[in-house]
């Protein structure tokens, strides 16, 4: 679903899949989020986003890739993670629309993550005792620099999915800084149980907003 001048229309597809894999000889997981606008919406703004994240069975980030076509803009972000003692090193690669490639390497003495891996970590949080406004701070790798992000708990809400079922959900906002102001990127609705299954995603995009529902 896509919000265009306050009218919701069926605008494309979005899917999220997490599956077990073997990465560098070890058991791991691969999570992917794919969004694709419909032919109708393509006339106004084409969107083709594919995000992949690899992480260990303990949810330690291993690799991240985002390939995106948003309108006339196309770019690819990649991050490779390596660890030594208490240090985390990220090797970043950014491909621009013009074909220029930028590479950076940084070492941190704290945990860093990426957006998709952070969402998986959220599913393992224990929200017992959380009040509205509770905030978890995250250091997010991606693009050309490290981004300071946060997850804000918005409370609980009953959500109806595309399968017509209703779910009691926890509501969480993923927020980054843009031009020194908070910018909500995604709002997650996950089931209020031990599994925290994603039921709905509200994505706030450059050209409007979109919603994806559990089928």
What are these regions (language model features)?
Residues 1-85, 124-215:
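Acidic, serine/threonine-rich low-complexity disordered tracts
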């Amino acid at each position: 679903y896509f919000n265009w001048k306050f009218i919701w229309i069926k605008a494309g597809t979005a899917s999220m899949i997490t599956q077990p894999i073997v990465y560098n000889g070890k058991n791991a997981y691969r999570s992917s989020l794919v969004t694709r606008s419909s032919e109708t919406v393509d006339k106004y703004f084409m969107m083709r986003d594919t995000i992949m994240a690899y992480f260990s069975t303990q949810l330690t980030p291993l690799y991240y890739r985002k390939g995106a076509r948003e309108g006339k803009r196309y770019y690819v972000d990649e991050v490779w993670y390596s660890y030594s003692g208490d240090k985390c090193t990220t090797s970043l690669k950014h491909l621009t629309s013009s074909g220029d490639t930028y590479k950076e390497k940084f070492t941190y003495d704290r945990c860093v993550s990426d957006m998709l891996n952070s969402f998986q970590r959220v599913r393992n949080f224990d929200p017992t005792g959380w009040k509205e406004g509770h905030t978890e701070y995250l250091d997010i790798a991606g693009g050309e620099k490290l981004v300071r992000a946060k997850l804000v708990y918005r409370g609980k809400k009953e959500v109806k999915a595309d399968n017509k079922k209703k779910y009691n959900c926890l509501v969480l906002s993923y927020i980054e800084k843009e031009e020194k102001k908070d910018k909500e990127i995604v709002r997650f609705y996950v089931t209020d149980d031990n599994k925290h299954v994603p039921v709905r995603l509200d994505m706030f995009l450059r050209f409007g907003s979109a919603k994806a529902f559990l089928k």
